[in-house]
From Swiss-Prot:
Its main location: cytoplasm. The keyword Protease does not apply. It comes from Yersinia enterocolitica serotype O:8 / biotype 1B (strain NCTC 13174 / 8081). This is DNA protection during starvation protein. One of its GO terms (molecular function) is oxidoreductase activity, acting on metal ions. Its EC number is 1.16.-.-. It catalyses: 2 Fe(2+) + H2O2 + 2 H(+) = 2 Fe(3+) + 2 H2O.
Length: 169
């Protein structure tokens, strides 16, 4: 079989794949996956912004904690993007798209205290965690639902860690 036949787009704009998930489910799942790609890219960048710029009590503990968060976020991000492609879609993760489509509020760049960063991070982690939980119930592709469930567990744990470090909720 020629390569041209394998990548030829159908009328639906999905890229040909032998994956037998129905086209409607693929389309809806790819949409959800790409929404999560956008959110996880933004959350990853926000996490690094805080990691670089915080100062104050508990700096080193929170600084190192955020490194672990970012690694896990990037692992889930990669899984979501690759799943979109596995289903015949295109992973949409450019800086322009993230800026245009993220539901997260712009992260303040003029804050410095560990506590201020923890609050801002907790707010944004909460938004993404809640979206992922909703996506679990909406998606009809069981493999993607499993991916969302794994991400949800990690995000809930990270949110708990952030909130546990906040002095004043």
């Amino acid at each position: 079989m020629s390569t041209a036949k394998l990548v030829k787009a159908k009328s639906s704009e999905l890229i040909y794949t032998r994956n037998d998930v129905d086209e409607h489910t693929k389309t809806l799942t790819i949409k959800l996956l790409n929404e999560l790609v956008i959110q996880f890219i933004d959350l990853s960048l926000i996490t690094k912004q805080a990691h670089w710029n915080m100062r104050g009590a508990n700096f080193i503990a929170v600084h190192e904690m955020l490194d672990g968060f970012r690694t896990t976020i990037n692992d889930h991000l990669d899984t979501f993007a690759e799943r979109a492609v596995q289903l015949g879609g295109i992973a949409l993760g450019t800086a322009q798209l993230v800026t245009e489509k993220t539901p997260l509020e712009s992260y303040p760049t003029r804050i410095h205290s560990v506590q201020d960063h923890l609050k801002e991070l907790a707010d944004r982690y909460g938004v993404v965690a809640n979206f992922v939980r909703k996506a679990i119930t909406e998606v009809k592709d069981e493999d993607s639902a499993d991916m969302f469930t794994a991400a949800s567990r990690d995000l809930d744990k990270f949110l708990w860690f952030l909130e546990a470090n906040l002095e004043n909720q």
